[in-house]
Amino acid sequence: MSTQLDASQPSNDVASPAAYDPTQKQKSQAKTARIPIKVIPAERLKKPEWIRVRAAAPGSRFYDIKRILREHNLHTVCEEASCPNIGECFGKGTATFMIMGDKCTRRCPFCDVGHGRPDPLDAQEPENLARTIAALKLSYVVITSVDRDDLRDGGAAHFVECITKIRELSPITRIEVLVPDFRGRLDRALAILNAGPPDVMNHNLETVPRLYKQARPGSDYLHSLKLLAEFKALHPDVPTKSGLMLGLGETDEEILEVMRDMRAHNVDMITIGQYLQPSEHHLPVLRYVHPDTFAMFEREAYAMGFSHAAVGAMVRSSYHADEQAHAAGVN
């Protein structure tokens, strides 16, 4: 299979491992070649019948959303992370905006977002983002970002600027943020977020602690739980949320234990979906979880006291996020 690059969009060029340039965005093999954990290509498991991806139909809002994003120099995690639900979500006029650029300072080998030395923050981004959301008349948005370990606050102030500007230009819009872990700067980041807390606070644990070194190099399971718990302590009325992906080698009991940890740290909502390998250079899928197993996790989530659980093969962190938030009392 060959891949054609669009010369009109140089930001999507992929640097080769042999000619490493930290200012260029590395994806796929160029990205994973330099992580401490070696990704060994494996024979791909055959996708089962319950894995279905909906393509956007010509004439849907899919193309309108993409055009508006390009006009305002904005990125979505839907595109950058190759989300399988992009057709459905763009088609109905929803998107998860990715701020602070499209180059992440981490190299997680499950993720399709590019790695590289990030560009300076765009001072116009909060304004451009807010104007776009107002123009699209969106009632609910999710704002996420790449990891910005190069910034003293991890990007917390930029999140607050975006939240503030959105509320100024589109007061009807409810805002969920999906934040990085702010590792090494958590206290500073939480203090800054106090100035403009979101309507929903989301931070994904992604996988079980045993697999962190392999799947999330540079991250720490207990630190991520601490982030969620400390934010909740500061803002008890703001729902908190976290997500997991299945298929990296975890066991069902390990997933249930992580769910218990989430509840012990006052996480209100949970998403659980199937990991899909973006390329042969990313971590392989070691199992496709059967719908009956997803149904079991959903039952267990409600039994544990989660206010809402979105669980299924194609579920992603911000999939139907507006419906999840409404179920948790965000109006």
UniProtKB/Swiss-Prot annotation:
PANTHER family: LIPOYL SYNTHASE, LIPOYL SYNTHASE, MITOCHONDRIAL. Pathway: Protein modification; protein lipoylation via endogenous pathway; protein N(6)-(lipoyl)lysine from octanoyl-[acyl-carrier-protein]: step 2/2. It is found in: Cytoplasm. It comes from the Bacteria. It is an enzyme of class 2 (transferase). GO terms for cellular component: cytoplasm. InterPro entries: Aldolase_TIM, Elp3/MiaA/NifB-like_rSAM, LIAS_N, Lipoyl_synth, rSAM. Disulfide bonds: none annotated. Belongs to the radical SAM superfamily. Lipoyl synthase family. The lineage of its organism: Bacteria, Pseudomonadati, Pseudomonadota, Betaproteobacteria, Burkholderiales. Binds 2 [4Fe-4S] clusters per subunit. One cluster is coordinated with 3 cysteines and an exchangeable S-adenosyl-L-methionine. [4Fe-4S] cluster 2 binds at residues 104, 108, 111. This is Lipoyl synthase. GO terms for molecular function: 4 iron, 4 sulfur cluster binding; lipoate synthase activity; metal ion binding. Transmembrane segments: none annotated. Residues 1-14 have a biased composition (Polar residues). Residues 1-32 are annotated as: Disordered. Residues 89-307 form the Radical SAM core domain. Its EC number is 2.8.1.8. NCBIfam families: lipA, PRK05481.1, PRK12928.1. [4Fe-4S] cluster 1 binds at residues 78, 83, 89, 318. Its main location: cytoplasm. HAMAP family: Lipoyl_synth. Keywords: 4Fe-4S, Cytoplasm, Iron, Iron-sulfur, Metal-binding, S-adenosyl-L-methionine, Transferase. It catalyses: [[Fe-S] cluster scaffold protein carrying a second [4Fe-4S](2+) cluster] + N(6)-octanoyl-L-lysyl-[protein] + 2 oxidized [2Fe-2S]-[ferredoxin] + 2 S-adenosyl-L-methionine + 4 H(+) = [[Fe-S] cluster scaffold protein] + N(6)-[(R)-dihydrolipoyl]-L-lysyl-[protein] + 4 Fe(3+) + 2 hydrogen sulfide + 2 5'-deoxyadenosine + 2 L-methionine + 2 reduced [2Fe-2S]-[ferredoxin]. The keyword Glycoprotein does not apply. It comes from Bordetella avium (strain 197N). Pfam families: LIAS_N, Radical_SAM.
